UniProtKB/Swiss-Prot annotation:
It comes from Methylocella silvestris (strain DSM 15510 / CIP 108128 / LMG 27833 / NCIMB 13906 / BL2). Belongs to the complex I 23 kDa subunit family. [4Fe-4S] cluster 2 binds at residues 72, 102, 105, 108. This is NADH-quinone oxidoreductase subunit I. It catalyses: a quinone + NADH + 5 H(+)(in) = a quinol + NAD(+) + 4 H(+)(out).
Length: 162
């Protein structure tokens, strides 16, 4: 027993083993990303900042069915519908989302029959004041216009699983 301990101490086997382990990890590719400059690929199902979409002809998609308002567990969505138009359809006059209350569950997106409200790919929407987290219809439509290409691609990629 003493001879075994003396050999370990003399040849520094534990030190050499630890050194070799360190060298193995030293030369492997780094798993850490330099975030602002490097980003992980996002899933098509990523739930980020909300957006209201428009049809390709420019007409907004929301038909004021209020399913998203009804299903929201945080009660973060407020909708007011305008009067029926000549063709029998409705559109919203007010569409507000309180992003402070929102829990990003995605129920609003799943409930929408026309894919009007979606949670887009944007994860970087920090603000300086709490009031900026109250999104009105104009802000949501602006988000939809900004992210429409990626949103449409993500919906198409996710279509087989819906």
């Amino acid at each position: 027993m003493k001879l075994d301990q003396a050999a370990k101490a003399l040849f520094l086997s534990e030190f050499v083993g630890a050194f070799l382990l360190s060298m193995r990890y030293f030369f492997k590719p780094k798993p850490t990303l330099n975030y602002p400059h490097e980003k992980n690929p996002q899933s098509p199902r990523y739930r980020g900042e909300h957006a209201l979409r428009r049809y390709p002809n420019g007409e907004e998609r929301c038909i004021a069915c209020k399913l998203c308002e009804a299903i929201c567990p945080a009660q973060a969505i407020t909708i007011e519908a305008g009067p029926r138009r000549n063709d029998g359809t409705r559109r919203t006059t007010r569409y507000d989302i309180d992003m402070v209350k929102c829990i990003y569950c995605g129920f609003c997106q799943e409930a929408c029959p026309v894919d009007a409200i979606v949670e887009g790919p944007n994860a970087e929407f920090s603000v300086e004041t709490r009031e900026e987290l109250y999104y009105d219809k104009d802000r949501l439509l602006e988000n939809g216009a900004r992210w429409e290409r990626e949103i449409a691609r993500n919906i198409a990629l996710d279509a087989p699983y819906r």
